[in-house]
């Protein structure tokens, strides 16, 4: 078998954006409002041909990721992953640019999912299948050490990021070249992709084949909410409620006395830029009537 570099160009350059000079076209306002350079607002490369991923391939991609995740022996909070068509649409659009690299966090953000979306990219100049590429990303485990960042293990770290519960992928052909893109929600952050402990240690009530299965729960917890992976329910900040923390529950008065301090009263524009003040003083900060 050829080496990774011989078979597929697989790089993780999250800080580099390659959309400069790419023509743009009108797109759904939900994307352009995130940023005018959003990937969904780009024009496809004239040489790009979409490679349709069959349902069988989608299922295989998800299954492979879940097997990879379930084999992490010391992960206490590893979530089961599922397919997401929204992520897949953006991944496909980036694949149609025929660019070996990443489009940047803001450019592949999904407006319906708060927080960062991660991305793995691969390239091949001969016939490879998507499962082949997923395997190559996973092979980076050979260089992986928990808690130690290694530029050669970025794809694998994204695959095993505990909170990455949704995935969508796209593929294109540009002449003899093949481009593979998978977008993940959420994006890995740092070099500790999961909490160490016994398998399903943090989710005994939702455990499924060594993974925390919240696929029947909300897609995301909005407005600063967090997902309890044991109950698969959102834990919402006090101003918010509902299954995904999008129902505002305004109080009759602000929560803290400090909201009436002269400094806050006289200069709310300044003080309300701080998240704790905005949370404590929803009326003073104009979030509630």
Curated annotation (Swiss-Prot):
Subcellular location field: Secreted
Record PTM: Contains 11 disulfide bonds.
Tissue expression from the record: Expressed by the venom duct.
UniProt KW keywords: Cleavage on pair of basic residues, Disulfide bond, Gamma-carboxyglutamic acid, Secreted, Signal
Domain SCP: 62-184
Modification type 4-carboxyglutamate: residues: 33
Name of the protein this chain belongs to: Cysteine-rich venom protein Mr30
Native source species: Conus marmoreus (Marble cone)
